[in-house]
């Protein structure tokens, strides 16, 4: 069994914000798997699905971004899952907009949701699907930038990026992060 976590903030006011791209990917992954977020546990919405041969719980923590790790840590402990069973999808300021990258470990890069997950699972050594949102304009607070909504004209690019992130997540679940990284990151570099 695997746990896929899309990071974001609950509430309609955060829909379509850069910081909620993890929720968007989780929603699309569940939709493609024919699953729905019908379970509520660990202060999170959960959808049970199958990705290839793997049973997967897709999670959207409802704790707000900075406390996402509480839900993730509780779920890992309850299901007795290891870090190799965890895939976290989140926005990333350090990647160009719409670029998708899969990595294992590394720092949180100032992302408070990732920082919280690291603290509550005891390590950064889990798979992360990073979805690039780019840097804010000069003199703009990064918090205001990530809480800003994607522009209407960005729909096509965002949809394509979400599909790439869903595919990266699926590969990480089915192949394991190490094997999946070669495919995902090669495609991401080729798209530049």
Swiss-Prot record:
Subcellular location(s) per record: Cytoplasm
GO biological process: protein quality control for misfolded or incompletely synthesized proteins; rescue of stalled ribosome
Binding site for tRNA: 14, 64, 66, 112
Active site, renumbered: 19
EC number from the UniProt entry: 3.1.1.29
Any one Gene Ontology cellular component term annotated for this protein: cytoplasm
Reaction equation(s) it catalyzes: an N-acyl-L-alpha-aminoacyl-tRNA + H2O = an N-acyl-L-amino acid + a tRNA + H(+)
Function summary: Hydrolyzes ribosome-free peptidyl-tRNAs (with 1 or more amino acids incorporated), which drop off the ribosome during protein synthesis, or as a result of ribosome stalling. Catalyzes the release of premature peptidyl moieties from peptidyl-tRNA molecules trapped in stalled 50S ribosomal subunits, and thus maintains levels of free tRNAs and 50S ribosomes.
Subunit composition and interactions: Monomer.
Protein's name according to its UniProt entry: Peptidyl-tRNA hydrolase
Organism field: Anaeromyxobacter sp. (strain K)
């Amino acid at each position: 069994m695997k746990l896929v976590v899309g990071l974001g903030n609950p509430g309609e006011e955060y829909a379509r914000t850069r910081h909620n791209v993890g929720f968007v990917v989780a929603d699309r992954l569940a939709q493609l798997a024919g699953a729905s977020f019908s379970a509520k546990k660990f202060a999170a919405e959960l959808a049970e699905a199958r990705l290839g041969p793997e049973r997967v719980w897709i999670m959207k923590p409802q704790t707000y971004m900075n406390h996402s790790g509480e839900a993730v840590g509780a779920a890992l402990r309850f299901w007795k899952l290891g870090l190799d069973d965890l895939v976290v999808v989140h926005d990333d300021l350090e990647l160009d907009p719409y670029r998708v990258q899969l990595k294992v470990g590394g720092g949180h890069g100032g992302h408070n949701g990732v920082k919280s997950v690291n603290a509550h699972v005891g390590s950064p050594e889990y798979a992360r699907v990073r979805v690039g949102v780019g840097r804010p304009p000069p003199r703009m607070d990064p918090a205001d930038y990530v809480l800003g909504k994607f522009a209407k004209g960005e729909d096509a690019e965002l949809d394509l990026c979400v599909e790439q992130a869903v595919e990266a997540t699926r590969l990480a679940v089915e192949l394991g992060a190490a094997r999946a990284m070669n495919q995902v990151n090669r495609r991401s570099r080729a798209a530049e």
